[in-house]
Structure formats: C-alpha cells, structure tokens
Amino acid sequence: MQLMEKVVDFKKLSVEKKQVLFEELENFDRQIFPNAIPVELHQLVYNPDVVALPIIRFYHRGKIVGQNIIAILKLKTAHQPLYILSSRAAFLPDYRNQNRTLLSAIRVTLGYRLKYPTRQLWFVSSLMQPKVYRLFASRSKRFYPRAEVPMPEDYLQVLDLMQNRHVNVQQRSEVVFVHPCVLPQTTPEQLIRLRNRASRHINFYMQHTPDYFIGMGLMCICKLDVLTLLEAAMNVFLGREVA
C-alpha cells in the first residue's frame, strides 16, 4: 500500500496558516480520538515551551489517512535543558499497521538531532497498545522499560521528571509508570487482535499494563542519539527485531 507523506514545521508557519492547519489537524484527530478533551490538542500544538513541531501527514490516493504530530518540548533543569520529544499519531483503522510511519518519524527526528548535536534529546511517550509497544521495543535495545533489562539511571531520572507532569500516575515497579490516556476509537475485536501475537515484548507489556483496554498507557523512554536513531531506522527498514 503506497502512502505519500508531507512534512511541515508548524512553528515556522504564519499565524493564518497555523489556524488553517490546526483546524485540519483537529478535524482528523477527532475522528480517531472522539473522547479526547477538546482543548488537549490545542494545548499540545500551542504550548510555548515547544521549540519544534514537525507534522507528518500521510495520504493514500489523495485522501489523508494519518497524521503524526511530533512535539519537541524544552524543559529547564538545574544542570542543563532537556529536550523531550513526544508523538501524537492518528491513523484510520486500515492504515495502523504501516511501519513506514515509524521510519518517517525517525527520519524527521534524525534531521533535528543532526541540526542540534549538543542537545539532550529524549523520546518520552505513553503507549496504549501492546502492538505499538512491541513496534518500538523490538527496534532498539535502548528503549525502556523492557523485559529483564535494568533501566540506566539517567533514563530513570528523566522518566521520573516526566511522570510528575501527569495526573493519576500509578507506579507499578521501580521503572514502570502508567496513567490514564485517551484511546483511539477501537472495536472490542480490534482490541483483542492488538495482543494476539505473543512475544517477549507483548508479554512484558501485558504483565505491567493489562488494563490498557480501558485507557491505561505505559510511560516509555529512549535517548535519541544518532547511533540509536540509525540503528532503529535500519532495523525497521530490514524488518529486523531485537530482544
């Protein structure tokens, strides 16, 4: 299935173009997340602490079928600023298994990494589906938390900092944090299929987030250095998985 993509940095648009694009993003997002709080997307896109906001939009036969809003947030700490990348991806049901979407996000992130090589760049996101967790964890050994592998201390410090920005967080182990998220519109049959294929990664996710189907998300983290990004991109491209 051939997908065309367009990438735009929301932060670089004029006020008028931002308004037009935001309305388009909001309309599509509402199709996938009908239960989301209306101001949620607005707060993400117009957050003054977001320093870059690349948006990838996917098309099939001229029709938009998915979008990935990548927000890079600057956080001030006692030592040096941290740059936290998060992603809000929304796809029509027939297009949710396209690995190319991850490859596109890696490519955009790598461009930012090369442009600002001295910045501490982290990916922190709450994953709400076992298959999505498996997609990330199987592409890089530096993606945490993961089965039977201790999380490095610097990862845990950043994760602890970020979990304090959420509400109703549950700590289920030293390195496992979960909290309520907004699920995409999904049928019960689709939820079952999300965990049909047993694997080391899916088993780990199900062990710690068995209540994902009611909206609990597992907080995950990965340090986005050039080596990690290149390794993940190569693994996605070759269809290769890591334990």
Feature locations, PLM:
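A short, internal acetyl-CoA/4′-phosphopantetheine-binding micro-motif in the GNAT/acyltransferase core
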Residues: 88-97
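Conserved beta-strand in the GNAT
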Residues: 53, 57, 62-74, 85
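A short, polar/charged loop-to-alpha-helix boundary motif
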Residues: 75-81
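Terminal substrate-recognition subdomain of acyl/acetyltransferases
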Residues: 1-22, 26, 30-32, 41-53, ...
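Contiguous, well-ordered alpha-helical segments that form the cores/surfaces of helical PPI scaffolds
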Residues: 69, 84-88, 106-110
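Conserved acetyl-CoA-binding loop-helix of GNAT-fold acetyltransferases
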Residues: 96-111
